């Protein structure tokens, strides 16, 4: 019986030693795997960090946003590499859904939502002042609210900024400055207050500059000097800081 017990104990000891060797090997392999995974994770952090740190700005508007010498170009340069500025302007379009060219029926509107912006700049209303569009003026407020609500449903939960329309003078398009100043602006102000949004006054800085210093020949669209003024005011609305002075502001 003693020999049997001794034999049993000896077998148990041998099994235990063998077990320890196996466990040691497993631990060594696991340590190597963990080190590889940690290294891979650390290598991925810088790439992920850049993507996550980009603040996306969606510029919604008409030809003043989309066209030549547009303000999003210098705005992007002012903001720098931490920002991504998307130009979603559409030439000749209206905020009004019953307008002759409604912005909210365009691919640009859909793409702006897919962009998942962190900030949305709404600069629409100039083309709405035309007689054929302003006959639907009673719907301007609800349409502006609809656009705001649509962007607020984006997963990115963007900050929304409304821009007061810039002034216009005598022109061939039927754009009426008195409508922009006396009818559209009060609605923009009312909606901004209702939704607790920032309203950027782009009218006042250009009110006495509807000439060759800031506008092109048609008295509606801006040249580089005028667009630079817009970019500076919108930059301040986004960052709370004064815009930096740039050389070659319109170079992409």
What is each PLM-predicted segment?
Residues 1-60, 64-73, 77-82, 113-118, ...:
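N-terminal secretory targeting modules
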Residues 44, 64, 92, 167, ...:
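Residue-level detector of flexible, active-site-proximal loop/helix-junction positions
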Residues 53-59, 64-142:
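Conserved SGNH/GDSL esterase-like catalytic core that processes O-acyl groups on lipids
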Residues 73, 148, 189:
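Short glycine-/small-residue-rich flexible loop motifs, especially phosphate/cofactor-binding loops
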Residues 84-86, 159, 196-198:
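Conserved beta-strand segments of alpha/beta enzyme cores
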Residues 123-127, 150-182:
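Active-site segments of SGNH/GDSL-like serine hydrolases
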Residues 144-148, 185:
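Generic structural signal for well-ordered alpha-helices
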Residues 166-252:
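Catalytic His-Asp segment of secreted/periplasmic serine-dependent ester chemistry enzymes
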